[in-house]
């Protein structure tokens, strides 16, 4: 009986990935995002990543594999996940949770940097606020979204959307694949 559940879960994950692959624009946007990131690094820029919940963990994972390593040894790339607990608790307390990413970007973000956002709904107010600050500062925006892109649709320089309207975990599974592909492409572009 559990084998049927396991198989159904894996088949659903496959279906979501196939729907993502069916849209050629998604593949082009991954290439565009990798170029944007590599160009930023080559010009002394950095990437600042953010997300909420599981997407927050993915934002940290992305930054960690850029500053640490992915598969092979190579120079570290400048990446910061906006995840400092003292910053989040201070800004959350003093300004509200909707300001946690925007406030960090105000202090640390510079023209030529890239804001890398993850939101399965595309409606996270704290990320929308960060995008607004990024645009005002000349910071490029890459957004990994799901469903119909939500309020983030059309706001990013590059949006990579997983067109799934079910549970968020299926969207996150594709997001982590995108993250790994981006790192692989960045390494090739930086070599």
From Swiss-Prot:
Listed SUPFAM superfamilies: SIS domain
Annotated GO biological process: carbohydrate metabolic process; D-glycero-D-manno-heptose 7-phosphate biosynthetic process
Main location: cytoplasm
Domain SIS: 37-191
Cofactor note text: Binds 1 zinc ion per subunit.
Names of required cofactors: Zn(2+)
Compartments where found: Cytoplasm
Pathway: Carbohydrate biosynthesis; D-glycero-D-manno-heptose 7-phosphate biosynthesis; D-glycero-alpha-D-manno-heptose 7-phosphate and D-glycero-beta-D-manno-heptose 7-phosphate from sedoheptulose 7-phosphate: step 1/1
EC class name: isomerase
EC nos: 5.3.1.28
Keywords: Carbohydrate metabolism, Cytoplasm, Isomerase, Metal-binding, Zinc
GO cellular component: cytoplasm
Annotated PANTHER family: PHOSPHOHEPTOSE ISOMERASE, SEDOHEPTULOSE 7-PHOSPHATE ISOMERASE / DNAA INITIATOR-ASSOCIATING FACTOR FOR REPLICATION INITIATION
Misc. remarks from the entry: The reaction produces a racemic mixture of D-glycero-alpha-D-manno-heptose 7-phosphate and D-glycero-beta-D-manno-heptose 7-phosphate.
Family: Belongs to the SIS family. GmhA subfamily.
NCBIfam families from the UniProt entry: gmhA (TIGR00441), PRK00414.1 (NF001628)
Role played: Catalyzes the isomerization of sedoheptulose 7-phosphate in D-glycero-D-manno-heptose 7-phosphate.
Name listed for the protein in its UniProt record: Phosphoheptose isomerase
Higher taxonomy: Bacteria, Pseudomonadati, Pseudomonadota, Gammaproteobacteria, Alteromonadales
């Amino acid at each position: 009986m559990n084998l049927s559940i396991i198989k159904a879960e894996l088949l659903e994950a496959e279906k979501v990935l196939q729907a993502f692959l069916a849209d050629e624009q998604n593949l082009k946007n991954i290439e565009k995002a990798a170029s944007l990131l590599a160009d930023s690094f080559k010009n002394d820029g950095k990437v600042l990543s953010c997300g909420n919940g599981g997407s927050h963990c993915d934002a940290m994972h992305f930054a960690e594999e850029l500053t640490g390593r992915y598969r092979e040894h190579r120079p570290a790339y400048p990446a910061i996940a906006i995840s400092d607990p003292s910053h989040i608790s201070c800004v959350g307390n003093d300004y509200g949770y909707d300001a946690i990413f925007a406030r960090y970007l105000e202090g640390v973000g510079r023209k030529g940097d890239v804001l890398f956002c993850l939101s399965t709904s595309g409606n996270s107010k704290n990320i929308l606020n960060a995008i607004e600050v990024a645009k005002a500062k000349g910071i490029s925006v890459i957004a990994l979204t799901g469903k119909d892109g939500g309020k983030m649709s059309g706001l990013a320089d590059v949006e990579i959307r997983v067109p799934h309207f079910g549970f968020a975990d299926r969207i996150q599974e594709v997001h982590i694949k995108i993250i790994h592909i981006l790192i692989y492409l960045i390494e090739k572009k930086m070599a």
